[in-house]
Regions:
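The first long alpha-helix at the start of the GST-like C-terminal all-alpha domain
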Residues: 205-207
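Iron-sulfur-cluster electron-transfer modules
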Residues: 1-139, 144-203
Length: 207
């Protein structure tokens, strides 16, 4: 990235660095902290999803969220699922025999807690085509920590994913990301750039 720029600047990363300086000087904003807790919100949603979804539709609650957290009152938050993709996969029985290929599913926090059907459909299509699917332990890719330039939290969030995914790609598994393009970009581009375990992160990026 940046090669097409006159001065070969990777502008998105330049902005991230600028945000990092701002965060270092002023600290994290409340909405940055809130939006980075995707795994925690997903866990709460698995227990209290219907209640949280109902409350999020109340205009006065959205008004308070706008004033306190900084999430615009007209912004509709994605609904939380009580049956997470992780729960579904644990109970899922694969019928694949003699697979033609094998993949490790990186579900993303969005697929796990919000759009579970997306993950289910991906697995069903892959298995229909005789592809073995595994879903190892994982957490949010860490992208929400990059927006404010919180590199320490990003590394803390991403390192366990790298260690786990590396085990599988070393066995010949390919990575399938089900979820927002930001998550794919994070694994492919941000992990190699921002994490110190460069060999493992690069292997994941190429898978």
């Amino acid at each position: 990235p940046g090669k097409e720029h006159e001065f070969e600047l990777d502008f998105p990363k330049l902005m991230t660095r600028a945000q990092a300086i701002r965060t270092k000087d002023r600290g994290l904003k409340l909405n940055d902290i809130f939006l980075s807790k995707t795994d925690l919100l997903g866990t709460l949603g698995s227990y209290f999803g219907p209640l949280i979804n109902f409350v999020n539709r109340i205009s006065i609650v959205r008004w308070f969220m706008d004033k306190i957290i900084g999430i615009h009152k007209d912004r509709k938050l994605p609904e939380l699922a009580t049956l997470t993709f992780e729960k579904w996969f644990k109970n899922h029985k694969s019928v694949v025999q003699d697979p033609i290929d094998k993949v490790v599913i990186f579900g993303t926090c969005y697929t796990n807690s919000n759009d579970v059907d997306l993950g289910i459909s991906a697995v069903e299509i892959l298995e229909h085509n005789n592809v073995e699917c595994v879903y190892p332990k994982q957490q949010c890719c860490g992208a929400p920590h990059l927006s404010p330039g919180d590199f320490d939290s990003f590394k803390k969030q991403a390192d366990p994913n790298v260690e786990e995914l590396y085990k599988w790609v070393s066995k010949g598994y390919k990575i399938i990301v089900t979820g927002p393009p930001t998550c794919s970009l994070t694994l492919k581009s941000e992990y190699p750039d921002y994490l110190e375990m460069s060999d493992k992160a690069q292997k994941i990026s190429e898978s």
